Amino acid sequence: MLDKVKGRLIVSCQALENEPLHSPFIMGRMAKAAMEGGAVGIRAQGVEDIIEIKKVTGLPVIGIIKRNYEDSDIYITPTKKEVDELLTTGCEMIALDATNRVRPNNEDLKELIKYIKENGVLVMADISNYDEAIKAQEYGVDCVSTTLSGYTPYTKTLEGPDFVLMERLVKDLEIPVIAEGKVNTPQDLKKVFELGVHSSVVGSAITRPQLITEKFVKAIEIN
């Protein structure tokens, strides 16, 4: 899968229960549209969505399950329970929160990564800073993604992608770096590839029409 997505675009097709497009059928069609536009991989949330997307597109899928737990702020594939659910989908890669925060039930990140790999599936570490990426590489993940930069209490929220972090990771890591998080424009995408990232995930800017519409409405209101 990593060879297939090198230098190409991955599109995130997700709609949570409180969002207008929440439906495996709709996400399957969204992924098909992304494929027709040139995407070579899909990041998707939830067992039903992943199965539908794989059936409709045949593209490799990075699978996640978002689930909230009372004893942790981690919600992207937080525990072994979500991993086991994802292993039933046939997704080629599982992404999980690899930040320094405490996992639900105090589960161990290193053991989760080992478990996924023992089941023959690639692992993407969603990180928020440099140290987390280094640790994830030591734990044996196949790639790191900058998904959570700006989304942890100890990282700075930026308007756009964390170019500084990406550049540093590309320079220092031996595994592929995937750009993800606030890649909002084709110009952003071009820049992250110029920094040397392996691939990039774009989500909201392509597949969340309520947010896209909101940007246009705000432009009117400003004037």
Curated annotation (Swiss-Prot):
Origin: domain of life: Bacteria
Q: Which GO terms describe its molecular function?
A: N-acylglucosamine-6-phosphate 2-epimerase activity
**GO biological process: one example:** N-acetylmannosamine catabolic process
Q: Which GO terms describe its cellular component?
A: cytosol
Pathways per UniProt: Amino-sugar metabolism; N-acetylneuraminate degradation; D-fructose 6-phosphate from N-acetylneuraminate: step 3/5
Transmembrane regions listed in the UniProt entry: none
Q: What class of enzyme is it?
A: isomerase
Catalysed transformations (reactions): an N-acyl-D-glucosamine 6-phosphate = an N-acyl-D-mannosamine 6-phosphate
List keywords of the entry alphabetically.
Carbohydrate metabolism, Isomerase
Q: What is its EC number?
A: 5.1.3.9
Per the entry, what this protein does is: Converts N-acetylmannosamine-6-phosphate (ManNAc-6-P) to N-acetylglucosamine-6-phosphate (GlcNAc-6-P).
Q: Of which family is this protein a member?
A: Belongs to the NanE family.
Q: What is this protein called?
A: Putative N-acetylmannosamine-6-phosphate 2-epimerase
Source organism: Clostridioides difficile (strain 630) (Peptoclostridium difficile)
* Gene responsible for this protein: nanE
